[in-house]
């Protein structure tokens, strides 16, 4: 079983109220990120702030839900995420969109997405979803004809899970404890110095680059 298939099965088990559009949205985001062009930074920050202000805190919700291909959903109701300033969350989104752009005509990622959709259909045939393979086929016929647009969550899914998240790089999830410590230092008006240690090939350079781009700081 591939990592994508295993992760898909895990998410289907965690959120069994998924309808075809919800499953497609999950797989779409794992390939194409947020799937649309982001507004200017100021608007992005205000949208995040406004949505977070309306959300009740949910301590049972994990800060991040991994969706595959190095991406995750950052859950805005999770306490650890709410503790970060909206400006930082917006910057995470912008950096992720730079690395994972929206789908384009003739996108080379489309065959991979189609493969993922075949895994979703196999899951439906195996009884892992509440919707049938026939229902998924009907949805996908219209979806493909429309040019593979970003999908929206179903009313059923929204009622069951109240999704409120942003799609970002999974590297930021790994960095969360460090980000929290850095933000504490910044809030106190103190300088922050981060030291990343680990064996060769463990990802230190990648994470250092993420930090540098996130804060505009030298490495």
Region annotations inferred by a language model:
Residues 189-194:
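Pre-Walker A (Motif I) flank of P-loop NTPase domains
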